[in-house]
Structure formats: structure tokens, C-alpha cells
Amino acid sequence: MDQFIKQDETGDLIETGMNVANHFLSAPIQGTNSLSKASIIPGVAPVLIGNPEQKNIQHPTASHQGSKSKGSGSGVRSIIVPPSEAGNGGTQDPEPLFAQTGQGGIVTTVYQDPTIQPTGSSRSVELAKIGKERMINRFVEKPRISTPVTEFKRGAGSGCSRPDNPRGGHRREWSLSWVQGEVRVFEWCNPICSPITAAARFHSCKCGNCPAKCDQCERDYGPP
């Protein structure tokens, strides 16, 4: 038996294979008939039964109709983003200190860089980065005059932790927020005896020695 294929037989095999390929390529596509990742509809199990693979299961018509009616009430919902959130990247954070009256503070609006136009959830992140960089470069704390440090004695306690702290003063605090597509920096003073909290808020003096105003917050109240 001759194990070698002749040249004319090779041409016939190639022509036959090309005809078979052209037949399937020219045939109209009725739908997805194979179990592939693209043919599976994301969702719960009742919805998955309604895939094109259902025709390969026994009793295709009855099972397919029943699965579609069951899947329609299976609780699968589409997520709809409100127009307000889709346009500006989410709910705007109100400034927590705006509602308080009788307190001094300075509000600085830092506009967004026109070269950066983030959308969605990344918008607030980009705005916060811009505001943080500009705030760090703009607000530089003045060097403080060094005070003599007393000798430490074990058990003597700290003067800053006692309610009768004779050295009252203020500390400067900042709060970053974005409103209407703008980064706003709000700065104010709090007594040094007040606690440091994550939320932006005003505190009153607890030791009785902190001044009402200091050289840092005098400009917060405007001209006298």
C-alpha cells in the first residue's frame, strides 16, 4: 500500500477542506449554540437556564418558557445611576462648619486644574489630590519661638495635660471638602487643650487659659 499522497490528491484534499470551510462561513448565524463564556448571561441560576444551551436539554420548549417566566421575577435588577451623581461624580459633601455661626474661619476655594477632567468616583479623588498639594504649598506654618524646657521629673506630670495649664494657646486646623466641582479649604483655630478629632469642628477652651483670639486667627474675624 502506498503511504505517500500524490500531488494531485493533495490538491483535492485542500480544495475539499476549503469548500467545507466556505460552507460554514457563508451559512447564516442563528444564535449562540456553544457553551462559552460569552453566551452565559450574568445573573442567578434561574436566568442562566434561559441561555441558548437550553435547546440541548430534554424538553427544550417547555423548560425554556418556564425558565424565562421564572427568571423575570427572580429579583435581578439593573443598577441605574441618577443623573445628578453621574454628572458630578457623586453626592456633594457639605462643609460641616458652615452651619455654625459666631465662629471665625477662612474659606479658600481651590479650583480644579483644567487639564484634569476626571469623571465618576475618581473625580473626588483627583480633586482631593489637587487641593492637598495646593494647601501644602500655600499654608506654611511660621516658625515658633522656642521656649526653655524644664527638667523632666518622673511622676511630676505634664503641664499640657493638666486642666490648669498656665500656657494657653491655639492650634491651626484645616478641613478639605469639594463642593460644586471645586476644592474648598477651611482653616480655623481651636484651643490647644481641646481634643483633636477626625471630624472638623470647633471646640471651646477647657483649661480657662486659652485666649479668645491669637495671632493666627485674628484675620479669621476680618478687620476690627
Curated annotation (Swiss-Prot):
Binding site for Zn(2+) 1: H170, C189, C214, C217
Composition bias type Polar residues, residue spans: 54-65
Localisation per UniProt entry: Virion; Host cytoplasm
Principal place of residence: virion
UniProt keyword annotations, A-Z: Host cytoplasm, Host-virus interaction, Inhibition of host innate immune response by virus, Inhibition of host interferon signaling pathway by virus, Inhibition of host MDA5 by virus, Inhibition of host RLR pathway by virus, Inhibition of host STAT1 by virus, Inhibition of host STAT2 by virus, Interferon antiviral system evasion, Metal-binding, Viral immunoevasion, Virion, Zinc
Superkingdom classification of source: Viruses
GO biological process: symbiont-mediated suppression of host cytoplasmic pattern recognition receptor signaling pathway via inhibition of MDA-5 activity; symbiont-mediated suppression of host JAK-STAT cascade via inhibition of STAT1 activity; symbiont-mediated suppression of host JAK-STAT cascade via inhibition of STAT2 activity; symbiont-mediated suppression of host type I interferon-mediated signaling pathway
Span of the signal peptide: none
Record region (Disordered): 54-96, 150-171
A GO cellular component entry from the record: host cell cytoplasm
GO MF entries: metal ion binding; molecular adaptor activity
Binding site for Zn(2+) 2: C193, C205, C207, C210
One of the Pfam families matching this protein, by short name: zf-Paramyx-P
Family: Belongs to the paramyxoviruses V protein family.
Role, per record: Plays an essential role in the inhibition of host immune response. Prevents the establishment of cellular antiviral state by blocking interferon-alpha/beta (IFN-alpha/beta) production and signaling pathway. Interacts with host IFIH1/MDA5 and DHX58/LGP2 to inhibit the transduction pathway involved in the activation of IFN-beta promoter, thus protecting the virus against cell antiviral state. Blocks the type I and II interferon signaling pathways by interacting with host STAT1, STAT2 and STAT3, and mediating their ubiquitination and subsequent proteasomal degradation.
Record text on subunit structure and interactions: Interacts with host IFIH1/MDA5 and DHX58/LGP2. Forms with host DDB1, CUL4A, STAT1, STAT2 and STAT3 the mumps virus V-dependent complex (VDC).
Descriptive protein name: Non-structural protein V
